[in-house]
């Protein structure tokens, strides 16, 4: 069974999902391409994992790095996506990394930054699995499902100097 809850963030409302034990999704509502991943039987119910996730998000949005992590699950995701999402979890608070650097960390010489970008773009647990910390090699702020302005706001919240980044005129997840 799947469960859902809502969180009111300073950047807009978010939907949280769980399998009953772990967090399986967190995304901004109006960019919710993940809604199709919810089973028809998803029940809106407050669970301990949602309370814990809400506390984590409260700390995060206060401008501090949370000292705890809610339990998360990537469900039925394939090995490649899981590997990329685990790399995302290792990106330190207040730092960024490029798609190409993530590809190199996978230790597969045939892996491209574009393939990594595809997996990053399918990250179902926004902010907590920090896909917003990934930028283009040229400093472009591309590819955040919550929108580029939110990505910029999240980076600023973490104390990152965003002057070195550029916002694409058109492209992904604007």
Can you annotate each of these PLM segments?
Residues 1-111, 157-174:
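Basic nucleic-acid-binding alpha-helical/helix-turn surface characteristic of O6-alkylguanine DNA
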Residues 111-153, 162:
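Short glycine/serine-rich loop segments
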């Amino acid at each position: 069974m799947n469960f859902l809850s809502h969180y009111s963030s300073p950047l807009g409302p978010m939907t949280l999902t769980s399998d009953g034990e772990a967090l399986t999704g967190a995304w901004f509502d109006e960019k919710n391409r993940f809604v199709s991943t919810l089973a028809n039987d998803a029940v809106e119910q407050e669970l301990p994992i949602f309370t814990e996730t809400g506390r984590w998000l409260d700390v995060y949005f206060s401008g501090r790095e949370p000292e705890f992590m809610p339990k998360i699950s990537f469900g039925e995701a394939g090995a490649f996506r899981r590997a990329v999402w685990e790399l995302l979890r290792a990106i330190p608070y207040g730092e960024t990394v490029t798609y190409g650097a993530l590809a190199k960390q996978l230790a597969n010489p045939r892996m491209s930054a574009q393939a990594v970008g595809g997996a990053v773009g399918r990250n179902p647990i926004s902010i907590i699995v920090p896909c917003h910390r990934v930028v283009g090699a040229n400093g472009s702020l591309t590819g955040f499902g919550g929108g580029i302005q939110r990505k910029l706001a999240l980076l600023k919240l973490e104390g990152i100097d965003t002057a070195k980044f550029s916002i694409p005129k058109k492209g992904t997840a604007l």
